[in-house]
């Protein structure tokens, strides 16, 4: 039988499609790309629009407020959503999560008036990744592998070494316990999973911090799936695949002008890393690490139960090459330099004139009380200050209720062109904040004072 719907379907011109996509995005700010495409098919069943064209057109659709995206400056639209596992009210009572229209995704806004210097919340990373500059300190037991606190001397009294390997050392028992899910999971401990040694050595030799983040995400999910209550693995799945902003690393790098020259080498490199990760965290029955890995899963299980094989759906979701590229892009978008991945911090969007300051403050820092506000922001860190990877979120100046909380993803002292290029290469978008618009007419994107 002839499909009359398909026969009658038309391909709308950009003049018709782009305004429709702008309205669609405005009306459904909480939906990702695929759900928006499904909604478009519901609203306009007479149209024939492929996913490839839809993605490209969405980048060129008119922006909120009447402005239009520059066709020469199309942005990558990240898949994102809300993370139901974060109890924002208890972490940051004066802050709430908001879904913005126009493909911007989620962000944070003030619920109440905030004063200069006010501490909004403090947060530890849920996935810890180390700066390459810390490697020598970590391998010499001069720094805690969990919180990055410096030791006065190697392996000081009361500190806790990993009981299974020599590659991790901790301030105390608390940091060691936290590390089992965030910085030194059993599945990546060389003493428990010998194949992890070559992977971690590769990461540190190459300074592949984003790969470290992917490895620890996979190790945490696999551990929670095997050993903990099922709810934790499901909670993490929602955070990763529905809550955090992500763009495939391949899609991101395909936008680079030199992609045609580097694509072959990059694809080969990614395939190699993917194979290494799979052999360490999901070895096939024919791989030499399969039986040792199965024994490890059994030994760490509270009841020494035999592991249940991953389903085909789980393998595709977590260990396929496409998922690896998605996770690599996710870590690149959300990773904070001082410690790794932070759940609530990852909600904040960029501005070249941010109203929020993110700091690693001394452990002696005491937040100001309400009756002492407003106050100046804390002074720079001094030599000898004991700091960690805990983030302290501060208001740079007075912030009104409903105002979005923003941070700068790049060095604010760079020129407009330098900032925008860094944001495009690192995060997939061309900044159009108020400062960038003001400086647009200034020759050479004048640098900030």
Swiss-Prot record:
InterPro entries, sorted: SET_dom (IPR001214), SET_dom_sf (IPR046341)
PANTHER family found in the cross-reference section: HISTONE-LYSINE N-TRIMETHYLTRANSFERASE SMYD5, SET AND MYND DOMAIN-CONTAINING PROTEIN 5
Catalysed reaction, written as an equation: L-lysyl-[histone] + S-adenosyl-L-methionine = N(6)-methyl-L-lysyl-[histone] + S-adenosyl-L-homocysteine + H(+)
UniProt keyword Nucleus, yes or no: yes
Compartment(s) of residence: Nucleus; Chromosome; Cytoplasm
Domain SET: 93-410
A GO molecular-function descriptor: histone H4K20 methyltransferase activity
Upper classification of the organism: Eukaryota, Fungi, Dikarya, Basidiomycota, Agaricomycotina
EC assignment: 2.1.1.-
GO cellular component, one term: cytoplasm
Protein name listed in UniProt: Histone-lysine N-methyltransferase SET5
Keywords carried by this UniProt record: Chromosome, Cytoplasm, Methyltransferase, Nucleus, S-adenosyl-L-methionine, Transferase
Family, as annotated: Belongs to the class V-like SAM-binding methyltransferase superfamily. Histone-lysine methyltransferase family. SET5 subfamily.
GO biological process, one term: methylation
Short name of one Pfam family: SET
Record function comment: Histone methyltransferase that monomethylates 'Lys-5', 'Lys-8' and 'Lys-12' of histone H4 (H4K5me1, H4K8me1 and H4K12me1, respectively), thereby controlling gene expression and remodeling chromatin structures.
């Amino acid at each position: 039988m002839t499909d009359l719907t398909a026969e009658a379907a038309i391909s709308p011109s950009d003049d018709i499609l782009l305004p429709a996509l702008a309205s669609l995005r405005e009306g459904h700010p909480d939906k990702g790309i695929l759900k928006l495409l499904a909604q478009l098919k519901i609203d306009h069943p007479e149209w024939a629009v492929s996913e490839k064209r839809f993605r490209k057109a969405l980048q060129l659709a008119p922006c909120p407020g009447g402005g239009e995206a520059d066709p020469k400056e199309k942005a990558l639209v990240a898949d994102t959503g809300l993370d139901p596992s974060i109890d924002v009210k208890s972490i940051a009572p004066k802050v709430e999560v908001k879904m913005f229209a126009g493909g911007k995704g989620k962000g944070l806004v003030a619920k109440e008036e905030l004063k200069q210097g006010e501490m909004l919340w403090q947060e530890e990373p849920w996935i810890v990744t180390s700066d390459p500059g810390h490697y020598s300190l970590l391998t010499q037991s001069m720094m805690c592998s969990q919180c990055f606190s410096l030791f006065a001397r190697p392996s000081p009294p009361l500190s806790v070494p990993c009981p299974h390997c020599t590659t991790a050392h901790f301030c105390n028992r608390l940091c060691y316990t936290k590390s089992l899910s965030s910085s030194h999971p059993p599945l990546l401990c060389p003493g428990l999973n010998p194949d992890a040694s070559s992977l971690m050595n590769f990461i540190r030799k190459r300074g592949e911090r984003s790969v470290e983040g992917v490895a620890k995400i996979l190790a945490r999910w696999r551990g929670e799936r095997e050993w903990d209550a099922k709810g934790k693995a499901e909670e993490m799945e929602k955070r990763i695949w529905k809550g955090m902003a992500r763009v495939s690393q391949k899609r991101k790098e395909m936008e680079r002008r030199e992609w045609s020259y580097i694509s072959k080498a990059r694809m080969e490199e990614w395939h190699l890393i993917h194979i290494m990760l799979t052999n360490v965290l999901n070895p096939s029955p024919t791989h030499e690490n399969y039986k040792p890995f199965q024994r490890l899963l059994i030994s760490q299980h509270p009841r020494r139960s035999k592991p249940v094989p991953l389903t085909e759906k789980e393998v595709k979701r977590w260990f396929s090459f496409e998922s690896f590229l998605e996770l690599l892009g996710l870590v690149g978008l959300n990773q904070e330099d001082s410690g790794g991945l932070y759940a609530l911090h990852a909600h904040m969007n960029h501005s070249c004139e941010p109203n929020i300051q993110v700091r690693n403050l001394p452990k002696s820092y005491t937040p100001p009380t309400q009756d002492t506000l407003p106050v100046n922001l804390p002074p720079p860190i001094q030599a000898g200050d004991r700091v960690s990877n805990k983030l302290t979120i501060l208001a740079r100046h007075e912030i009104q209720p409903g105002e979005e909380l923003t941070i700068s993803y790049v060095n604010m002292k760079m020129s407009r062109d330098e900032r925008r290029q860094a944001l495009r290469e690192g995060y997939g978008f061309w900044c159009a904040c108020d400062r960038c618009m003001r400086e647009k007419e200034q020759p050479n994107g004048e640098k900030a004072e």
